[in-house]
From Swiss-Prot:
NCBIfam families: PRK05715.1-1, PRK05715.1-2. It is a multi-pass membrane protein. NDH-1 shuttles electrons from NADH, via FMN and iron-sulfur (Fe-S) centers, to quinones in the respiratory chain. The immediate electron acceptor for the enzyme in this species is believed to be ubiquinone. Couples the redox reaction to proton translocation (for every two electrons transferred, four hydrogen ions are translocated across the cytoplasmic membrane), and thus conserves the redox energy in a proton gradient. GO terms for molecular function: NADH:ubiquinone reductase (non-electrogenic) activity; quinone binding. The gene is nuoK. This is NADH-quinone oxidoreductase subunit K.
Length: 102
């Protein structure tokens, strides 16, 4: 089976990570921020898998499973926080939710 070259896989992972980072910095909607975090975590998982396949080591796949389980935990906790913020402030805007009310 022919695998993709290491440079191409890491380039795709880098582009995905940068896209997630831009989405994290630009967006103010907490749902899009969570999606950007997921993209960044998946990009790092892709880098682990590509590097592991390059040297024929299973460590990349083990790290992929770890990253996916962390992403699932982050998504469930993040969505629970998102629902509570929406119930309390009636918005998903990060700036509006961060204002202190006395």
């Amino acid at each position: 089976m022919n695998a993709i070259p290491l440079e191409h896989g890491l380039a795709v992972a880098g582009v995905l990570f940068c896209l997630g980072l831009v989405g994290l910095m630009v967006r103010r909607n907490i749902l899009f921020v969570l999606m950007s975090l997921e993209i960044m975590m998946n990009a790092s998982a892709l880098a682990f898998v590509v590097a592991g396949s390059r040297w024929a080591q299973p460590d990349g796949q083990v790290m992929f499973i770890l990253v996916i389980s962390l992403a699932a935990a982050e998504a469930s906790i993040g969505l629970a926080i998102l629902m509570q913020l929406y119930r309390r402030f009636h918005t998903l805007d990060i700036d509006a939710a961060s204002e202190m009310r006395g």
